[in-house]
């Protein structure tokens, strides 16, 4: 791709992407536009501007995407009760399509003919970024330095940075032994001692939550208000999507909620161990299932449950911008029209317990479900014919001598 003139780089300001910035300038002799996304990762993003300016970058984008991230990506995903492989709440996966979208938007605004990212050739993120980019701008060029260069260790990156005058920190505060990724939905930890699947993670690894053992001895109760499948208020106070998630992270983390240690199957074929903190997302998943339990028709709920693993897989593997994900999203969103009401939760030492749910759109009828006298609301004698009709095929098979035992 020697003909690249201008490239938009997804830039964090850290060692890897700072080396990539200089490497792009030298290898491709091109202009580099930097893009730094604030997704609620809790780190200062402004230092990225100063570092990019020091490296001669003229066009610098630093975007606060927190509200868009939760409103247009996290909330739609949680309407489906999305979980990958039974446990993972897709905190990293769901952030990538938004970053890809902004990379392409900035490329269009600046006239760039290429984009670049710092994802390695071993992981899922390279796939997620690039599938999104090609879906939104089919002719875009993609530069993935980790698949091209020979700087395959941290020491080599440090040496390159020193040689080319890139500001780095060799000393100072202790660097975490883990590879971490954070946004408003979660923080993830990989590498280090976690590469041994038998070794327990260290307690001081966790950053967002207390251990369940050290959580308060007094339970915390909260009420979440839903409108069309999304949380709009906490304890009766209306909040923006990003504020909802930030507040639930704080409340959940204080009660030891949302820790996870799993081995997942990456799209590229390998298994990978990761630890995740997703306190707000853990609360949201439990609460959303609870409000759906009284507002969704049975067959709609069961169909959603059947389709959810496919929907989760599409997000995990980078197909957010695919026609099949968009089709599923329309179905999921249509199911949420009546998902309105309030869920009351008890948070205690790592546990999220639903203790109440109510809705003007509830399909729960106490007059029918009661164990007491129902006043004729339900005729129990009707069940006999229902059972016989549903047993018909099995009775026919038995009469034909089909062995079941």
UniProtKB/Swiss-Prot annotation:
List of residues binding L-citrulline: 88, 93, 124, 128, 179, 188, 264, 276
GO biological process per UniProt: argininosuccinate metabolic process; L-arginine biosynthetic process; urea cycle
Q: In which pathway does it act?
A: Amino-acid biosynthesis; L-arginine biosynthesis; L-arginine from L-ornithine and carbamoyl phosphate: step 2/3
Entry's Gene Ontology molecular function annotations: argininosuccinate synthase activity; ATP binding
| Principal place of residence | cytoplasm
Give a single Pfam family match.
Arginosuc_synth
The listed locations are: Cytoplasm
Q: Which InterPro entries match?
A: Arginosuc_syn_C, Arginosuc_syn_N, Arginosuc_synth, Arginosuc_synth_CS, Arginosuc_synth_type_1_subfam, AS_cat/multimer_dom_body, Rossmann-like_a/b/a_fold
Q: Using the UniProt record, name the top-level EC class of this enzyme in a single word.
A: ligase
Q: Which reaction does it catalyse?
A: L-citrulline + L-aspartate + ATP = 2-(N(omega)-L-arginino)succinate + AMP + diphosphate + H(+)
Family under the similarity heading: Belongs to the argininosuccinate synthase family. Type 1 subfamily.
Question: What subunit structure does UniProt give?
Answer: Homotetramer.
Query: Could you identify this protein by its name?
Result: Argininosuccinate synthase
Source organism per entry reads Pseudomonas putida (strain W619)
């Amino acid at each position: 791709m020697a003909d690249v003139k201008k490239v938009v780089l997804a830039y964090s300001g850290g060692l890897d992407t700072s080396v990539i910035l200089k490497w792009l300038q030298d290898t491709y002799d091109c202009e580099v536009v930097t893009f730094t996304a604030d997704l609620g990762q809790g780190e200062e993003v402004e230092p990225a501007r100063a570092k990019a300016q020091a490296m001669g970058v003229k066009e610098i984008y630093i975007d606060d995407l927190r509200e868009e991230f939760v409103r247009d990506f996290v909330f739609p995903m949680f309407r489906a009760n999305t979980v990958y492989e039974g446990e993972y709440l897709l905190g990293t996966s769901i952030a990538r399509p938004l970053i890809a979208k902004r990379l392409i938007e900035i490329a269009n605004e600046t006239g760039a003919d290429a984009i670049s990212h710092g994802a390695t050739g071993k992981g899922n993120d390279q796939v997620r970024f690039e599938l999104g980019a090609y879906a939104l701008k089919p002719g875009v060029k993609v530069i993935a330095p980790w698949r091209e260069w020979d700087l395959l260790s941290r020491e080599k990156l440090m040496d390159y940075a020193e040689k080319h005058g890139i500001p780095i920190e060799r000393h100072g505060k202790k660097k975490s032994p883990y590879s971490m990724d954070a946004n408003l939905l979660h923080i993830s930890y990989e590498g280090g001692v976690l590469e041994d699947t038998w070794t327990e993670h260290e307690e001081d690894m966790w950053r967002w939550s207390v251990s369940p053992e050290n959580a308060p001895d007094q339970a915390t109760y909260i009420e979440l208000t839903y409108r069309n499948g999304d949380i709009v208020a906490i304890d009766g106070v209306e909040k923006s999507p990003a504020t909802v998630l930030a507040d639930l992270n704080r409340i959940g983390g204080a009660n030891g909620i949302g820790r996870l240690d799993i081995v997942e199957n990456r799209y590229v074929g390998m298994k990978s161990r990761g630890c995740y903190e997703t306190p707000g997302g853990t609360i949201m998943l439990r609460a959303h299932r609870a409000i759906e339990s009284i507002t969704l028709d049975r067959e709609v709920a069961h169909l959603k449950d059947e389709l959810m693993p496919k929907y989760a897989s599409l997000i995990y593997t980078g197909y957010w911008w695919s026609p099949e994900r968009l089709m599923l999203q329309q179905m999921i969103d249509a199911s949420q029209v009546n998902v309105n009401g309030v869920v009351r939760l008890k948070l205690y030492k790592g546990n999220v317990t639903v203790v109440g749910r109510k809705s003007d759109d509830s399909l729960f009828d106490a007059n029918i479900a009661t164990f007491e006298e129902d006043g004729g609301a339900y005729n129990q004698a009707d069940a006999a014919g229902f059972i016989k009709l549903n047993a018909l095929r099995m009775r026919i098979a038995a009469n034909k001598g089909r062995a079941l035992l």
